[in-house]
Design a protein with these regions (language model features):
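Secreted, disulfide-rich extracellular signaling modules
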Residues: 1-309
């Protein structure tokens, strides 16, 4: 946002789950669905307002009294939390860090001021209306976090290209795990809704769905992309949309090629954000069913059988 924004702070009164919270739902976990008494994380006990002006810095402050600090220090209160809301229309802000700063004066030494800082435990975003699910697209990230599930078709034999058939001495060629050097899903980015355009890099993660019959809350395997995931810059969903993004899945494909009958792992992958949720912005890609849809890229090394004299 380019101009001043008025912000309001209130103390929550209802228990909520940071991974599943929405504008109307405080908790939406397995066998536990609880709505907010008031849509929008309400009701709250109003604490105060402040104005953030980007021309004056990147931080905003709310003044708290000792009673509110004491209430938030009660770890037995599962409803404790704070709602920060924008009171300015047509403004979009991303809260990257929240700190509770305490200036205390010990009774034993009243001439001394001690400054303490407490980091936040959980954070999420609620808003209304939530964008409609894409009719034939892939969406990753946002808050609540969007995920996309793909069934991957792994070929057991290759019939081309012609250069491969010549190198192998003919086709079809059986695809073996040891001959696979690299495998990746290639996604083509697209421009999403303006209000949800990423302004920072997004870390894409890929995990194997361990039980497809348990979707949409199926358990997932370990990350196939590492700690930080596959990083994609924000321009890929704006000025540089239609960019090809590769997400390596080599070990996943090797495991499928090497699996035995009756012990085949699931061929379903979940595409998600590394950190969920981190902002309302999400990544958009073209979905299956058209020329810009996901593509499986394979790099193999093959050689002809040779006979020694």
């Amino acid at each position: 946002n380019n101009g001043p924004v008025e912000l309001g702070l209130g103390a929550t009164q209802t228990p909520w789950d940071n991974r599943t919270v929405t504008w109307v739902t405080a908790v939406d976990t397995l066998n536990d669905l609880r709505p907010w008494p008031q849509p929008g994380a309400g009701p709250v006990t109003s604490i105060g307002t402040t104005v953030w002006d980007p021309a004056e810095g990147d931080s905003a402050w709310f003044e708290l009294d000792s009673l509110q600090v004491e209430a938030w220090a009660d770890t037995a209160d599962v409803s404790r939390g704070a709602r920060i809301e924008s009171l300015t229309d047509n403004a979009r802000l991303q809260v990257s860090r929240v700190v509770l700063r305490l200036d205390t004066r010990p009774s034993s030494n009243p001439d001394t001021i001690i400054v303490l800082s407490a980091q936040r435990d959980e954070i999420s975003f609620v808003y209304d209306p939530i964008p409609e699910a894409p009719e034939n697209g892939i969406r990753i990230g946002g808050a609540p976090a969007w995920r996309t599930v793909l069934n991957v078709k792994i070929p057991t034999h290759l019939d081309g290209p012609a250069e491969l058939c010549v190198a192998a001495g003919g086709c079809p060629l059986e695809l073996k795990p040891l001959e696979l050097n690299y495998a990746a899903i290639t996604l083509k980015s697209e421009r999403g809704e303006q209000a949800f355009q990423p302004t920072d890099s997004i870390g894409l993660d890929v995990r194997q769905v361990l039980r497809r019959d348990a979707l949409p809350k199926a358990p997932l395997g370990e990350s196939l992309t590492g700690l930080l995931g596959q990083r994609v810059g924000p321009d890929a969903f704006g000025s540089k949309s239609e960019t090809d993004i590769e997400i390596p899945i080599t070990e996943f494909v090797r495991d499928l090629l090497g699996s035995q009958d009756g012990m085949s792992p699931t061929k379903t992958l979940a595409l998600l954000s590394v950190f969920e949720p981190i902002s309302i912005a999400y990544a958009s890609f073209h979905g299956p069913g058209n020329e810009n849809g996901p593509v499986l890229r394979l790099v193999v090394t093959v050689g002809r059988a040779m006979e020694l004299p």
